[in-house]
Amino acid sequence: MKNEKKKSGIEPKVFFPPLIIVGILCWLTVRDLDAANVVINAVFSYVTNVWGWAFEWYMIVMLFGWFWLVFGPYAKKRLGDEKPEFSTASWIFMMFASCTSAAVLFWGSIEIYYYISTPPFGLEPNSTGAKEIGLAYSLFHWGPLPWATYSFLSVAFAYFFFVRKMDVIRPSSTLVPLVGEKHAKGLFGTIVDNFYLVALIFAMGTSLGLATPLVTECMQWLFGIPHTLQLDAIIITCWIILNAICVACGLQKGVRIASDMRSYLSFLMLGWVFIVSGASFIMNYFTDSVGMLLMHLPRMLFYTDAIGKGGFPQGWTVFYWAWWVIYAIQMSIFLARISRGRTVRELCFGMVMGLTASTWILWTVLGSNTLLLMDKNILNIPQLIEQHGVARAIIETWAALPLSTATMWGFFILCFIATVTLINACSYTLAMSTCREVRDGEEPPLLVRIGWSVLVGIIGIVLLALGGLKPIQTAIIAGGCPLFFVNIMVTLSFIKDAKVHWKDK
């Protein structure tokens, strides 16, 4: 019994370093918010301007990797000996469900405003040209390109899971073919895992920092409770307590049911917006935007604005590519887990088609609605953001729809459930990654899960205290830098091992 406890307890070398690093950064930030904002602006400017090109080339190279997987020698290789665990319809639905987080609802509702008010390519703000390129850029940032780049990592993890039968809970486990077992399980592997965990903690904290204001603004609209930082902190605390109760009482089945509810409610809410906002305009705008995307795609892929220095690619494209990089391992592990028995080609095509459809639907419907409200002078979004913040502006885009009270209740429930499941997933992923071997069917220790959910909650509160989107963007970009190299190493390790193992099969 004693040995079992030791086996399933924390792994000190990957538990304490991220905890200490993140704790110190939070303490330094809270100690002087003004100084922290100065540092944040400097870090953001340095990474995006000096190293932004690297993120763009990373995405382009990984896109070529997708074509190699689909049409290359491994295209028909099966990821596991079993038949697919899920039907194709269920598989695609699970992919869609993974895209309906509160952070996605945040960006989907407001992103187009930023693209129109500060457009790329030297276009005039709020001009016809800016509006034409607005949704096209959303389709670029959340379309086939980033999902194609996830294919390589998803295939890699599925290969290690189901072909090589490796128990992978941290990225270092996949690096044995590349650097050898000694280094993968030694100091080098520990450093890689700590980079991954610190970045993942900040990524999850930023998602919480985006989601929480949506819920508290909904509460203000529905119940008249003023939105303050204290209310944000109270709501996050309630979520953490609710998560702890669910874990302690064995209510994980209830959390899974809530996750399914989130998916169905997402369909319902998007369908409602599509119908009442203007289905004909949305379809016309989407069609036009696909054409604009195809016309400008080469420039979008390589756009750094080195001469004009308008800042658009640094503020958005580099930021989003870092966002995709930082979530790549976590998301790819999930996609690999649900893809057992699929061929490499099936997984690559399924991801690009299924996941692109989900994100394009979200951004097209929500972005078109926001644009219509601006064009019809129903909402003054710049004024709302200046006086009340971004979250209030997002809430008002939903409140402006017919049956506003019912719509707001639906949006409130959707955001609340999405954030509950987010915290549950955060605590589970971090606990699994920082504990010794946890067998199938077992849960990581309760206190470890609660501890990580508390830390993620603290990061969310700190980012909210800093105010604005820049701290959130900087946290993502800073976290994406080390994972940039980790993702490349995992990819190279897969290529090296598959070249030997799949050579004669």
From Swiss-Prot:
Pathway the protein acts in: Amine and polyamine metabolism; carnitine metabolism
GO terms under biological process: 4-(trimethylammonio)butanoate transport; carnitine metabolic process
Principal cellular location given in the protein's record: membrane
Residue ranges crossing the lipid bilayer per the database entry: 10-30, 51-71, 92-112, 143-163, 195-215, 231-251, 263-283, 316-336, 347-367, 403-423, 446-466, 475-495
Keywords: Antiport, Cell inner membrane, Cell membrane, Membrane, Transmembrane, Transmembrane helix, Transport
Catalytic reactions on record: 4-(trimethylamino)butanoate(in) + (R)-carnitine(out) = 4-(trimethylamino)butanoate(out) + (R)-carnitine(in)
Entry's Gene Ontology cellular component terms: plasma membrane
Compartment(s): Cell inner membrane
InterPro entries on file: BCCT_CS, BCCT_transptr, BCCT_transptr_CaiT
Gene Ontology molecular function terms on file: (R)-carnitine:4-(trimethylammonio)butanoate antiporter activity
Membrane association type: Multi-pass membrane protein
PANTHER family reported for this sequence: HIGH-AFFINITY CHOLINE TRANSPORT PROTEIN-RELATED, L-CARNITINE_GAMMA-BUTYROBETAINE ANTIPORTER
NCBIfam families: bcct, PRK03356.1
Summary of subunit composition and partner proteins: Homotrimer.
Function: Catalyzes the exchange of L-carnitine for gamma-butyrobetaine.
Family: Belongs to the BCCT transporter (TC 2.A.15) family. CaiT subfamily.
The name this protein goes by in its record: L-carnitine/gamma-butyrobetaine antiporter
Gene: caiT
